């Protein structure tokens, strides 16, 4: 049989399709491998473990992701997005207030039903998870893959995590009252650090793993633009960012397995969390979409102001119309709004409840599972988001995104 005949055979075609499919799903395959390794050898990559993952991965892997971001983004666009206060308001209000309030209501309803299979501390962990700030690394990686505004995403994760050191403890004090008094951090005698120490730790982590590599990347890009572009395309550094994200999840699962988090709750609770996390992440993603593109704005502000328009219309248009974001910005907000950080989240939980608290493992289960499932779900959604973004390329002028927006949708 000749080579050409073999290539035309059904066996060769089916084998090629299977190999192409497996290559396309490399992220999920490696994720499964890393979870299996974390289960079998949790001491290797847990916090304080063999490789001191809180430094080698917590700082190193995150720094690589933001170094790549610094090398690939325009300094001018970075400054433009830093000034986009409307997007900051949308993401912060969704990430901290809307999501946590909805979860608080759901958890309170489950607690009121007196379901003995769902541990109260697991529900407390659910509330704690959704009071945490948005995740740092996966948001940037996923937004870049979806061809969204990853520069805006970078601004949101930095602002959200800096403020999260203050907002999350305040939210826990607000929610953990009455029927949830048992979970109030003020009643935990094993707390490890004060809010001031937590904030210092957060600023150190964000400074060394986000700001410094981002700054270095920007300097290198502006001094050596051609060489930087060549490196980005030749070495496919975007794939490197995705692999760094896998290492971060490897660390989270290793820490969870080392703390026996998954064996501290019932199988029914784990099954409930797995399906609940996927459903609530999709719900929050859809909710964030409508929050980012309110239909009433287009109905009220159909036309750009002109000389015959009233002052009220002109001022209202200038203030409200930019809240209807273009598609790239919408994708950035959609990925930031529902996401929750495990890196800072673990530090926040440990500082509030104490690393030696016997209930810590149960509290961390929702956080670790949600992080993994949000990344897997977002990895599926990015292809649809990418198609939606490029669908407007076929339209000469997209009235939904170009009029009154702070940012040009073509950027």
UniProtKB/Swiss-Prot annotation:
Database matches in Pfam families: SBF_like (PF13593)
Ranges per topology, Extracellular: 39-52, 111-120, 172-204, 264-269, 351-361
Sequence intervals crossing the membrane: 18-38, 53-73, 90-110, 121-141, 151-171, 205-225, 243-263, 270-290, 330-350, 362-382
Chain's role: Solute carrier protein that negatively regulates the cytosolic homeostasis in response to high levels of extracellular calcium.
Sorted UniProt keywords: Calcium, Calcium transport, Cell membrane, Ion transport, Membrane, Transmembrane, Transmembrane helix, Transport
PANTHER family referenced in this protein's UniProt entry, alphabetically: SODIUM_BILE ACID COTRANSPORTER 7, SOLUTE CARRIER FAMILY 10 MEMBER 7
Protein name: Solute carrier RCH1
Topology in the lipid bilayer: Multi-pass membrane protein
Species of origin: Candida albicans (strain SC5314 / ATCC MYA-2876) (Yeast)
One Gene Ontology term from the biological process aspect of the record: negative regulation of cytosolic calcium ion concentration
Subcellular localization, as worded in the UniProt entry: Cell membrane; Bud neck
InterPro entries in the record: Na+/solute_symporter_sf, Put_Na-Bile_cotransptr
Disulfide bonds: none
Keyword Nucleotide-binding: no
Effect of gene knockout: Leads to modest tolerance to azoles and terbinafine, but not to amphotericin B and nystatin. Elevates the intracellular Ca(2+) and leads to the activation of the calcium/calcineurin signaling pathway.
Family of the protein in this entry: Belongs to the bile acid:sodium symporter (BASS) (TC 2.A.28) family.
């Amino acid at each position: 049989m000749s080579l050409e005949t073999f290539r035309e055979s059904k066996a060769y075609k089916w084998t090629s399709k299977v190999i192409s499919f497996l290559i396309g799903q490399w992220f999920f395959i490696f994720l499964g491998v890393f979870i299996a390794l974390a289960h079998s050898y949790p001491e290797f990559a847990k916090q304080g473990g063999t490789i001191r993952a809180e430094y080698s991965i917590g700082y190193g892997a995150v720094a690589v992701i933001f170094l790549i971001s610094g090398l690939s983004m325009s300094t001018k666009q970075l400054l433009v997005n830093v000034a986009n206060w409307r997007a900051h308001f949308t993401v912060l209000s969704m990430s901290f207030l809307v999501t946590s309030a909805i979860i608080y209501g759901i958890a309170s309803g489950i607690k009121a039903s007196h379901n003995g299979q769902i541990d109260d501390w697991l529900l407390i962990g659910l509330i704690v998870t959704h009071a945490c700030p948005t995740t740092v690394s996966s948001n940037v990686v996923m937004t870049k893959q979806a061809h969204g505004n990853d520069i805006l995403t970078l601004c949101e994760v930095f602002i959200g995590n800096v403020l999260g050191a203050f907002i999350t403890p305040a939210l826990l004090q607000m929610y953990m009252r009455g029927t949830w008094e048992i979970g109030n951090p003020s009643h935990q005698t094993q707390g490890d650090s004060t809010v001031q120490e937590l904030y210092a730790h957060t600023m150190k982590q964000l400074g060394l793993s986000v700001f410094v590599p981002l700054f270095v990347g920007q300097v290198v890009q502006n001094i050596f633009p051609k060489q930087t572009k060549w490196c980005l395309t030749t070495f496919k550094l975007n794939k490197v960012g995705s692999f760094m994200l896998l290492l971060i999840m490897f660390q989270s699962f290793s820490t969870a397995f080392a703390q026996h988090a998954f064996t501290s709750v019932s199988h029914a609770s784990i099954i409930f969390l797995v399906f609940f996390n996927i459903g609530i992440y999709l719900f929050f993603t859809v909710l964030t979409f409508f929050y980012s593109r309110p239909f009433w704005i287009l109905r009220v502000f159909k036309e750009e102001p002109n000389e015959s328009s009233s002052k009220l219309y002109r001022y209202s248009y200038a203030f409200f119309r930019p809240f209807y974001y273009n598609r790239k910005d919408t994708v950035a907000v959609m990925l930031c709004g529902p996401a929750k950080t495990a890196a800072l989240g673990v530090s926040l939980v440990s500082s509030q409840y104490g690393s030696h608290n016997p209930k810590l493992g149960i509290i961390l289960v929702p956080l670790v599972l949600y992080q993994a499932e949000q990344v897997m779900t977002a990895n599926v959604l990015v292809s649809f988001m990418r198609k939606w973004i490029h669908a407007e390329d076929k339209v000469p002028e997209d009235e939904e995104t170009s009029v009154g927006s702070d940012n040009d949708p073509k950027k």
